Amino acid sequence: MDRSRVLEQLIPELTRLLSLLDHEYLSDSTLEKKMAVASLLQSLQPLPAKEVSFLYVNTADLHSGPSFVESLFEEFDCDLGDLRDMSDDGERSKEASPEPIKSPSLRSTADVPPPLPNKPPPEDYYEEALPLGPGKSPEYISSHNGCSPAQSIVDGYYEDADSSYPTTRMNGESKSSYNDSDAMSSSYESYDEEEEEEKGRQPKHQWPSEEASMHLVRDCRICAFLLRKKRFGQWAKQLTVIKEEQLLCYKSSKDRQPHLRLPLDVCTVVYVPKDSRHKRHELRFSQGATEVLVLALQSREQAEEWLKVIREVSRPIGGAESLEVPRSPVILCKLDQDKRLSQEKQNSDSDSLGMNDSSSTLSRREACEHGKGKKNSLAELKDSMSRAAGRKITRIISFSKKKALSEDLQTFSSEDEAPCCGYLNVLVNHGWKERWCRLRCNTLYFHKDRTDLHTHVNAIALRGCEVAPGFGPRHPFAFRILRNRQEVAILEASCSEDMGRWLGLLLVEMGSKVTPEALHYDYVDVETLTSIVSAGRNSFLYAQSCQDQWPEPRIYDEVPYEKVQDEEPQRPTGAQVKRHASSCSEKSHRADPQVKVKRHASSANQYKYGKNRAEEDARRYLVEKERLEKEKETIRTELTALRQEKKELKEAIRNNPGAKLKALEEAVATLDAQCRAKEEQRIDLELKLVAVKERLQQSLAGGPALGLSVSSKSKSQETTNKPQSSVPEQSLPVNCVSEMRKRSPSIVTSNQGRVLQKAKEWEMKKT
């Protein structure tokens, strides 16, 4: 096919290809190539097809021969004398006799150009000639938009002009065609304008890597990598995009979610030009009186371009140009802003300081900028301060200057009361970091500080996990959280009691049936082991008792709820409560820990010791005390009857020493056994009664101060509706206080000794 015809078909095809590429998202290198081809096509289209012979088209296939431009100069040979004989009016001499061409065998290897390629190049292959600068060699940039055969030409290769260009003979003297200014001037004279156009068409925004996410800038109005101002005057380069009436900031072009999302329809934008005070062109975004974002731009033109886009975004859709009213507040001029700030500085509070970089006001920023002494000291502080120290100083200043909100105070108070949170050392990247840990809904949350509970660093779902104490002899109070025998987290407590407390809480939250006593402890001595196990058992029992009621702690014993009766037993009056309270022994300050008291379902609704809780406890203990006293009177009556019968049998044995003596003795032995059993029942009732009286006294001690009032009901309903206290001891769980009391057997011994002594004295009086 004729070469000119191919070029005629190639130009419109390239034009259509470029129009299709205008609607595609291209990388920077591809965009540069496209603009270069477009400029070449624009310069070629007005010319007729026969005048496009100066276009550089490299027909070499896989670098197997010279380019098309080189082949043009291969047979260009003339004598200098023929050039002198040319007339001034432009007539050329027709009798130019070129020097005969040397045979290939006589030519040197360096003078012989490589042969022309036999097969045409691929359709998507082209070569672009860039303009020559002073002291530079011609630069050829080749590109493949599609698939190419093996050993394809790599993008951006360079050809050495001195070695690759063919030689030109003038007057019998061999010269390189590259140095022939007359021959090359016609080919390079028009590239100065194209060079300026290429500089103007270069893309402004450079992506840092090829794998950068291009979908971030899809359908956006404008995008660029801008500097965003952080706290303490630090700057960070972020990808800034305006899309769908929002300004989005990404920390990296690979991010999927924006780091900051700012609606422009509710913001005020102020442009601060670069001057002696401001080292950069800045755009300041504010919401109300709070400055939320500061961006730095490279030039005034770039700032005006961004302001133009922001005005277009804030402009109402479909409004007339003369009647347009922006939805966002008007973009203020810097001079007007300075006047307004000078008035606001007098009323600004000097103690106000935000918790983060988006909470400082415009007036505070301008006031700080005017204070040169503060600015210099802050600049020195920035140079010597690390990021961690900066965050700590911010928290300290904010804590001392800013008033805490009421809900934050309530959160802190509840966190202090509950044992399900505290500081732990966490192993992160082979280093220990202190974190505020919190248990909630079977999940362990890690916070940077106890004041920052709204965001957490990490969270671990505890269901299905295991806990294993020990992490080497250097960390005796460390323990590990395992899931499927894989370490999920390594934590370290500050002391043995803290370690035991966390172990008990974690075991309950994990739903494990293992108790703290069953765990295997290494690297601790016997004393420390006892402390860990004791604290672990206490927290384990506590967490079991109030597993579903975080974070309110319980005070009294936790027992299973009884069935709520349809008819509540009558409660005694307030006068009866006072009478019974005064009759309680003041010497009994300690109760038997083995005595368990049933908790009615109605009293389980209150979790803190308030007015309702005191009233419910007083009623329950009073009813229990009266029931025990009634049962005690019944046993005492039965015991008196048995002793009377025993006394009569002994008198009968004394009076009748005959044949019935053996039967009478057996009857007396049977009565003795019955009396001993009744006496044991009476002693148990005495112990229970002492414990109930003590707890009644404790509830009444807190009740009157809270306005306690106890209603009364009849004793007949009390006897019919109140169940018997025949619940076995094993079915009633107790809290950690009762378990601690179990460790002092002297309490039980002293109570039993007094009761037995009183019972013996009472028996001696009766007999």
Swiss-Prot record:
InterPro entries: AFAP (IPR030113), PH-like_dom_sf (IPR011993), PH_domain (IPR001849). The keyword Protease does not apply. GO terms for cellular component: anchoring junction; cell projection; cytosol; podosome. Keywords: Cell junction, Cell projection, Coiled coil, Cytoplasm, Phosphoprotein, Repeat. The modification Phosphoserine is found at S87, S93, S97, S103, S152, S328, S342, S746. Its main location: cytoplasm. Interacts with CTTN. This is Actin filament-associated protein 1-like 1. It comes from Rattus norvegicus.
